Regions:
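Residues within the DNA-recognition helix of helix-turn-helix
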Residues: 78, 82
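Pre-recognition alpha-helix immediately N-terminal to the DNA-recognition helix
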Residues: 22, 49-53, 114
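N-terminal helix-turn-helix DNA-binding core of bacterial DNA-binding proteins
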Residues: 33-75
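Short, hydrophobic-biased segments on the C-terminal half of alpha helices
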Residues: 65, 83-84
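N-terminal leader segment of winged-helix/HTH proteins
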Residues: 1-41, 89
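Generic structural concept
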Residues: 24-27, 55, 109, 138
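Charged, amphipathic alpha-helical coiled-coil/dimerization segments
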Residues: 5-7, 84-139
Length: 139
């Protein structure tokens, strides 16, 4: 019979629980603030995150639906639907991949770029307690 505990995993102590609680609290405050910023701009937080991940993919200016699904931790079909909603809103466009016809690249439109930069600037202003994001000079 199993006790429910996994072998090799120590139970957290009081200080660790306090640290986890503080982290979750700060994370939730940030997410709520992000929801407010995005909503005021007329987009959802998922749309903002998609725009951020398209532009924030290392080494290029686009991403595939599969890559976006991974970054969003979402199902590929749900991510494809989100891309379609962003495309209908004029924020992104799909382009066939020249080297792999099975892949479709998602690119920001000019409107999507403007929206992303505006929202990212507002988010960056609130990253103060997250110094690890930009280093000490980014806040």
């Amino acid at each position: 019979m199993s006790s429910g505990r996994q072998p090799g995993k120590a139970l957290p102590g009081k200080e660790e629980l306090e640290a986890m609680s503080a982290f979750r609290y700060e994370l939730r405050k940030f997410l709520r603030m992000s929801e407010e910023i995005s909503s005021a701009a007329g987009v959802t937080t998922l749309q903002y995150q998609l725009l951020l991940h398209v532009r924030g993919f290392e080494g290029r200016q686009w991403a595939t639906v599969g890559e976006l699904a991974e970054r969003l931790q979402a199902a590929p079909n749900g991510t494809a639907a989100l891309v379609s909603r962003c495309e209908s809103a004029g924020l992104v466009t799909r382009k066939p991949d020249a080297s792999d016809r099975r892949q479709v690249q998602v690119h920001l439109t000019r409107k999507g770029e403007r929206c992303l930069l505006k929202l990212a600037a507002e988010h960056k202003a609130h990253y103060g307690s997250f110094g690890w994001v930009f280093g000490d000079s980014g806040a």
